[in-house]
A protein has these predicted regions:
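Short alpha-helical donor nucleotide-sugar binding micro-motif in glycosyltransferases
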Residues: 237, 245-250
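A conserved mid-protein helix/loop that constitutes part of the nucleotide-sugar donor-binding site
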Residues: 18-25, 178-198, 215
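Short, structured helix-loop element that forms part of the nucleotide-activated donor/catalytic region
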Residues: 44, 201-229, 242
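Conserved donor-binding/catalytic core segment of Leloir-type glycosyltransferases
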Residues: 4, 164-181, 186-190, 203
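A charged, aromatic-enriched C-terminal amphipathic alpha-helix characteristic of glycosyltransferases
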Residues: 306-341
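Short hydrophobic beta-strand element within catalytic cores of glycosyltransferases
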Residues: 266, 271-279
Length: 341
């Protein structure tokens, strides 16, 4: 079977979407040929049965109309090179080319995992054979055709490493710097912990989109104004393949994104031996109560940091076991089975 994969970025060094390179590698083991159409192409080392076509954003920003035209031309030109279509995250591609795929009798499958959605999401989903997401609270979870999937983490990369020193009472935030990720709540929690005499350090890894640069700058300014610059450090986003050692160096990973997103970083951190505190309702259905974000964030952090060493290790082992159920190998197999029906 031949598959067309449509995605934003193919670049193994991209700090946000670099993980998808690993997804394509995993999927390639199940298909005779994979054609990828991406908005932006960067560094990649994909198998011989994978061919990448870019809409050209790596050469500079053009109008949406230009990209839409290029996309339609490619989907038509390459029509004999694929039997099924898998669109990752961006419903816009289905809204642009769904009518063409229907004429060509190509079944379409959409991956969309986010709490937000609208009537355009509904229109895109209506043309799909199946819709995939990982969260029961995703906007797309409401459709009868939706299938809940594993998050898809590469356990060959994400695993504990005793050679890396884990810093006691260290907290990690790793995500885009955006209001929806709530990094400001972590800063507020650290202030409250400091006032209680609880000593912690926090590392915040991630870049901001252009529309959130002012927000990111305000966080840095807040840290300076509060005199927390020796406690809270900011770092640029790094490629997904470089994150394991960052996870391994921290004791607690914090994710306070709204339910419906179910960030895969939760399970990457768990697989690397972090104690993970997350606000996601999906996550809280899987883990012991000690790892829930309840009441205030600072109370949740203090609770997990003051657990006996034996209990911490018990929770780490539990989390590592849960992360194995969310593996990329399992995800790629389930996607293949669903798309091949």
């Amino acid at each position: 079977m031949k598959l067309l994969v449509v995605t934003q970025v193919i670049d193994q060094n991209d700090p946000v979407l670099g993980f998808f390179h690993q997804w394509v590698v995993a999927l390639s083991k199940h298909y005779d040929h994979i054609t990828v159409i991406c908005l932006k192409e960067g560094t990649h080392s994909l198998p011989e049965n994978v061919q990448v076509f870019s809409l050209g954003k790596e050469n500079g920003n053009l109008s949406k109309r230009v990209y839409a035209s290029r996309f339609l031309k490619l989907t038509w030109k390459l029509r004999t090179q694929y039997d099924r279509v898998f669109v990752h995250m961006n419903q816009e591609y289905i809204l642009i080319a769904g009518w063409l795929w229907e004429i060509l009798n190509k079944k379409v499958y959409m991956w969309r995992n986010h709490y937000a959605g609208n009537w355009l999401t509904d229109v895109a989903a209506s043309t799909c054979t199946k819709v995939f997401c990982t969260s029961r609270y995703s906007y797309t979870a409401k459709y009868k055709k939706t299938v809940i999937m594993p998050v898809g983490i590469n356990l060959d990369i994400f695993s504990p490493d005793p050679a890396v020193t884990r810093i006691p009472k260290s907290i990690l935030f790793l995500a885009r710097i955006a209001p929806s990720k709530h990094p400001d709540l972590l800063i507020d929690a650290i202030v409250a912990l400091k006032q209680k005499g609880v000593t912690v350090t926090a590392s915040m890894y991630g870049d901001a989109l252009p529309e959130h640069v002012t927000y990111a700058d305000s966080l840095r300014q807040k840290v300076l104004q509060l005199g927390l610059q020796d406690i809270v450090t900011f770092h640029a986003g790094i490629p997904n393949t470089q994150t394991p050692d960052v996870y391994r160096a921290h004791e607690v990973f914090i994710n306070i994104s709204q339910s419906g997103m179910f960030d895969k970083t939760i399970f990457e951190a768990a697989a690397c031996g972090c104690l993970v505190l997350a606000a996601s309702k999906d996550y809280q259905l899987l883990v012991p109560e000690e790892l829930h974000v309840t009441q205030t964030l600072e109370e949740s952090i203090e609770r997990v940091l003051t657990l006996p060493a034996e209990k911490k290790q018990e929770l780490v082992v539990t989390l590592e076991g849960i992360s194995r159920t969310e593996s990329l190998a399992k995800l790629s197999q389930e996607l293949f089975q669903q798309i091949s029906k």
